[in-house]
Amino acid sequence: DLMKYDSKTKGNPYLDEDFKNGKLIFKNGKKYDALLRLNVSEQKFEIKKNIQSKASAIDIDESVTVKINDATYKLHSFNLGTKSNLIGILKECLVLDKYALYFFPQKKIEMPKESGIASPSTGYSKAPQPEWKDNSSFIIFHNGKTYQLPKSHKKMMELRLFDEKLYKKYRKANKLNLKNEESLKG
């Protein structure tokens, strides 16, 4: 069954609200074509046989690969320096010998930031509505460890994943944007 969400919340819990043509690929070689979308708040895929059919949520495990357009998704267990592991569906961005870069799609519900401007006193003020906000990040797997990619170059250097001089040179030459997948893939 699909999760029901508060209709008063602005936005949606999906990476992309529309169902896209995709494929479930199982370790045993079986493949299944379907319409898919990722519910990032539940970390589940929602699946339809065709546009008219009813959607249902599916759990995947490490033996299933999901392809939607050119993107590849898999369930991973990883640790970002806390006591317990996280389990999440990650989008494969770039896999090299020593490094692997993944996108970890996440959303959270937040109350909108209050503006400092006082509204005129009409005796009625509309209560602020909660909204779905992007909380995604990039993850690097390196030497058996997992790192959440910071949004600043200074914090990136503090991770000590790369030679500082080479990183600075590469960053300047390629106008590296730590928030952009295409920029990160080089």
Q: Could you describe each region identified by the protein language model?
A:
Residues 9, 20-24:
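Short boundary/loop segments of OB/S1/cold-shock single-stranded nucleic-acid-binding domains
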Residues 15, 25-153:
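Aromatic-patch recognition
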Residues 1-13:
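Sec-dependent signal peptide cleavage junction
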Residues 19-20, 142-146, 161-165:
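Short amphipathic alpha-helical segments, especially helix-boundary/capping motifs
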Residues 158-186:
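Long, compositionally biased interface segments
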